[in-house]
Amino acid sequence: MTLIDSHRPEIASKHVVARDFGAASDSYDCAARLQRHMGERLLAQLPRTLSASKVLDLGCGTGQFVPALSERYPQARVTGVDLSAAMVAHARRQRAGDYQWLVADAERLPLASGSVDAVFSNLMIQWCTDPRPVLAECLRVLRPGGMLVCSTLVQGTLRELAAAWQQVDPGVDHVNRFEAWPALLEQVMAVAPQAAVEQETVTLPYESPMQLLAELKSLGAQYKGGARRKTVTAPGRLRRLAQQYPRRDGEVLASYEAAYITYRRQD
């Protein structure tokens, strides 16, 4: 048995993912601290010297990084791609500029092979059942010499929140589970053996667990597993969560285990 087969996290359907993120389009940018941090690091991995006439932001959401990609490659046509039509509509309204927008499934991009110079994908593939088809599709559309930079989350993300919930509501999942680091490495190497993969722990402070939960909802990143409760969480359960969540210097901390993938297609 491969690492990939062991304890695969349950992922919501594409419809649920698109619905949740679309519903969060108006609140997303104000809450997207992690997305900004990871996206800026990802952007820095794209060399300005790359000759680029066509750039994709895959899983663009509200189009937060589309202007930055355009500034980095002023001669390029930048296209924001997202599964959520609501997100793409929001991005089109909010981002003034000569950009293109596309509603599409990352596993089946309506683009010619070898037609793109750079693919930028920030915090998208963790919502895929299996990242390998998406990575393979990214490599398919890359031109020789083109680059893929991609970020995702791995196991251990929001571990403080998960531990607190298990004290309050044992045996019930409340936090999304992500692929283990060794499994992600195996998946990436299966598609792109020359890729570089790096890991970073990002820790963000919050005033309370309630602020953390509100931020996740504002991002459309609330728990998506099939076992989630179908009713509103009782106030008493939330109070117990606040009591169980560890505090440091009056605030609570949330850890995110980030992974960054960089690949350059050989000429």
Label every PLM stretch briefly:
Residues 4-37:
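Class I SAM-dependent methyltransferase Rossmann-like catalytic core
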Residues 33-52, 68:
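Conserved alpha-helix/loop element of class I SAM-dependent methyltransferases that forms part
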Residues 54-108:
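Class I SAM-dependent methyltransferase SAM/SAH-binding core
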Residues 62-64, 196-267:
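Conserved Class I S-adenosyl-L-methionine
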Residues 107-118:
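A short acidic, Gly/Pro-enriched loop at the edge of an enzyme's catalytic core
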Residues 118-130:
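A short SAM/SAH-binding and catalytic strip from SAM-dependent methyltransferases
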Residues 132, 147-211, 222-232:
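Conserved catalytic/acceptor-binding region of the Class I
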Residues 132-144:
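A short glycine-rich, Lys/Arg-flanked "PGG" loop and its adjoining helix->strand segment in the class I
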